[in-house]
Amino acid sequence: MTTEQPKDVRTATDVVLEARSVTKHFPVRRTGKDLLARRRRTVHAVDDVSLELRRGTVTALVGESGSGKSTVARLLAQLYPLTAGEIRLGGTAVKAGRGRSFRAYVRQVQLIFQDPFASLNPVHTVRYHLTRALRIHGRAGSGATELEANLAALLERVQLTPPGQYLEKFPHELSGGQRQRVAIARALAAGPQVLLADEPVSMLDVSIRLGVLNLLRDLKERLRLAILYITHDIASARYFADTTLVMYAGRIVEGGDSESVTQHPAHPYTQLLIASAPDPGRIAGQEAREETGSGEPPSLIAPPRGCRFHPRCPQAMERCRTELPPRFDLAGGRWAACWLYDTAAAPAKEETK
């Protein structure tokens, strides 16, 4: 047994995992006032999110803290039940639940957590973590010799060599980057088709982030994995991802190829994200190309009507405050959920000037 995936006759653009109108609302604990008013409040963490993860490609889901992007990853990993919508694996709707059905699902879809310091049990060695994962997923082999070969193959795959130098180490004896590589190796032990990488480099030193992203890119190409890359860093999405989706307050507001989305953003929120990113070429006092908006994200217990970005948007129209914008197709396969791209809204925009 090796950690290589079996060859597949399907093309590299096949959809492996798909979310269709996925929604997740969390109930809020009722206070005395809620009981008296007979009301139930919910957090609208994710609303009507649709996305596709394709074999051999990286899809980035970008947004600021609290946008719901990590909740999307956990929904795709079947760690939370859906409020509405469906998840399809290989074209078939799935609802993993628990027990055997959940184990069968996670063999195909693995989640890499953000914190490499918390995702590994500090009292167990690297050997224990990887051996346990191989045995759970039936990939340990038929004997001790084959198990050792499989352990070595996993560590070599994540570029921790020589393997014997790492197998007997405890997590506290590893650097942050090495721990994250062990976490990736543990995910590969299942032989998955999909990796859900939830901010995999955000807690690592800047000097080693690029190495982990390059490792994930290598795995994508060698094993033809579909990868969802969750991040708040839109610059790294441009570097690492083939496709970028931008999420704000529980909804995806823009999508397209990463180069176009990051270099020519269509949605005002994407423009705000890019304008907020550090830019060494921006001279102090230099005027921005355009006003990009300011303020804080809205409460998801009582999200705004219409477009959820309208309280912060410098280009908001009256329609934005009352009607939720659909996706408008743009050139080159891109789209944006913004009334600015509805031709019927153009006259109204002129009137508000």
Give the role of each language-model region.
Residues 3, 9-15, 29-37, 164-165, ...:
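Short catalytic/signature loops enriched in Gly
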Residues 36-39, 94-110, 128, 136, ...:
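ABC ATPase NBD coupling module
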Residues 170-174, 178:
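Conserved ABC ATPase signature
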Residues 200, 204, 208-286:
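P-loop NTP-binding/switch modules centered on Walker-like glycine-rich loops
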Residues 85-96:
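Conserved ABC transporter NBD signature motif
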Residues 189-193:
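A short, proline-enriched helix->beta-strand linker immediately N-terminal to the Walker B motif
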Residues 77:
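Helix-to-loop junction immediately C-terminal to a conserved catalytic motif
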